[in-house]
A protein has these predicted regions:
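Cysteine endopeptidase catalytic domains of the caspase/legumain-like
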Residues: 1-235
Length: 235
């Protein structure tokens, strides 16, 4: 939700954003602040004015493939209708395991499956550049399968052999509010939306404890010192 709000604040409308989420926090019976989701104790309500396109429990890998295909149908009215000149920011936060990334409670998406989706997009010239940020345990395994795709850069919270750690325990609610990987990236982007990809990686790497933030496919993307996040956050 923090990325969603950041994009909205950068000038993007809901027509430019596809939001897939579990949507089980704001109105949860155990949430002391009904309708409120925060990343920090005194942070803004990230659920404010949110438009959810798909609930996670309704999404399988096949649904994901349709959404990324750019071809809408009755069941998938909102799709990634991007073209050769578009830069795509893709954020995925979920559980992960060596075999792949969790999609809801029962589906598991492997690295080979994600590579098929993204390679097809590349073959059809449906993005200029894509930045895929993955917050999940063992996320490096999926990213490694996607190497070789032109214009794609993947940054993961952990390599292929380790878990990713939660951060900021809030005792009154008995819950972790965020992940150090994400909080490091978000803080940097708020302070410098035009930060270079190299600097963003360094901030995430040094700010993340318990796992190794890793970049994949840089050789097929471009110069990380010269390329910046302004390409994804500037409308």
């Amino acid at each position: 939700l923090e990325y969603y709000q950041m994009l909205r604040n950068s000038g993007y409308s809901d027509d430019d954003i596809i939001l897939i989420m579990a949507d089980d926090l704001a109105q949860n019976a155990n949430n002391p602040e009904k309708g409120v989701v925060r990343r920090s104790v005194d942070g803004d309500n990230l659920y404010k004015n949110v438009v959810v396109d798909y609930r996670l429990e309704d999404i399988t890998y096949n649904d994901l493939a349709v959404i990324f295909s750019g071809k809408p149908d009755v069941a998938h009215p909102e799709v990634l209708d991007s073209g050769a000149g578009d830069n795509v920011l893709f954020f995925w936060s979920s559980h992960g395991m060596p075999a792949g990334l969790a999609l809801g409670d029962i589906d598991l998406v492997s690295g080979k499956q994600m590579a098929r989706i993204l390679q097809k997009m590349s073959d059809e010239q449906r993005f200029r550049k894509m930045m895929w940020i993955v917050e999940a345990c063992y996320s490096g395994g999926v990213a490694k399968e996607c190497e070789g795709i032109p214009g794609l850069l993947v940054m993961t919270a952990a390599n292929a052999n380790e878990s990713s750690k939660a951060d900021l325990w809030y005792a009154p609610y008995n819950v972790y509010l965020t992940n150090r990987f994400t909080s490091s990236i978000i803080s940097r982007l708020y302070s410098d939306p035009a930060t270079s990809l190299r600097d963003l990686y360094n901030v995430a790497f040094t700010g993340t404890l318990g796992s190794h933030v890793t970049i994949y496919n840089a050789d097929n993307y471009g110069n990380l010192y010269q390329n910046t996040m302004r390409e994804f956050l500037g409308k």
